[in-house]
């Protein structure tokens, strides 16, 4: 209940005159320490396909007055409708009640493969109650999207040795919310390290939000030697944040463009 009053009023004195201060009010204050406010739980989680989540706040005992508490919203997820909707605010438990909820609304079910994200709600500055033991609640939005598939957009190509470079396109089946990496190894009948071309073993990174990247065979040498066509074979392996597709090997053929020599006595 709220604070209560006892009012004493003097009247009808005998052998005296009633003064101006003839009323006294005594206030019985309700002890705030009789109840505290806190979250029902410190953590919870749900798939991003869940459109909303109600987070319970409990009061240990009823009050004759409204109990309010401020809350601030942080976490790795982005609010304002990007991942969810919930702004900083004030929660109210009406007089006579022992609970209320803060609702995380408009949780977005996107198509991006991404890490699980959090919404962290922190209570502060309660009125008509003391702060309880659980003042921070972390809600985890669990991603429900499969990792994209990564592979070459074609398994073979060719070009004359007069073509100085060749970009090989690596595709993702869908954009990802995370950077995607994939290792590649270079083999074939052509000789690297600047003899026929330049390309060493390495790692390709496709940035979050992008759907493709390129591996460049560069410094292709246009020599004057008549020779067989030569190959540069690039093999993808060990992707992170993606699944390796079936077209994981690309063979680029360097086509010789020199005439055979003339032989005579």
Regions found by a protein language model. Give the residues of each.
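Short boundary segments that mark the start of a structured unit
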Residues: 1-265
């Amino acid at each position: 209940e709220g604070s209560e009053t006892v009012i004493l009023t003097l009247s009808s004195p005998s052998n005296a005159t009633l003064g101006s201060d003839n009323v006294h009010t005594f206030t019985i204050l309700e002890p705030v320490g009789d109840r505290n406010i806190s979250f029902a739980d410190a953590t919870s989680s749900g798939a991003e396909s869940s459109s909303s989540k109600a987070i319970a706040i409990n009061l240990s005992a009823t009050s004759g007055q409204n109990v309010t508490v401020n809350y601030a919203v942080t976490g790795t997820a982005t609010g304002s409708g990007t991942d969810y909707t919930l702004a900083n605010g004030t929660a109210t438990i009406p007089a006579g009640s022992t609970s209320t909820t803060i609702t995380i609304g408009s949780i977005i079910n996107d198509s991006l493969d991404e890490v699980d994200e959090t919404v962290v709600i922190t209570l502060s500055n309660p009125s008509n109650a003391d702060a309880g033991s659980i003042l921070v609640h972390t809600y985890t939005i669990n991603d429900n999207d499969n990792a994209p598939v990564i592979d070459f957009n074609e398994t073979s190509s060719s070009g004359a040795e007069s073509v100085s470079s060749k970009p090989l396109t690596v595709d993702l089946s869908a954009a990802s919310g995370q950077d995607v990496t994939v290792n590649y190894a270079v083999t074939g009948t052509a000789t690297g390290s600047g003899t026929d071309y330049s390309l060493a073993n390495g790692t390709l990174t496709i940035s979050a939000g992008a759907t493709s990247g390129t591996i460049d065979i560069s410094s292709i040498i246009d020599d004057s030697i008549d020779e067989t066509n030569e190959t540069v074979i690039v093999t993808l392996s060990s992707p992170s944040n993606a699944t390796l597709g079936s077209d994981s090997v690309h063979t680029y053929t360097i086509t010789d463009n020199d005439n055979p020599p003339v032989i005579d006595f």
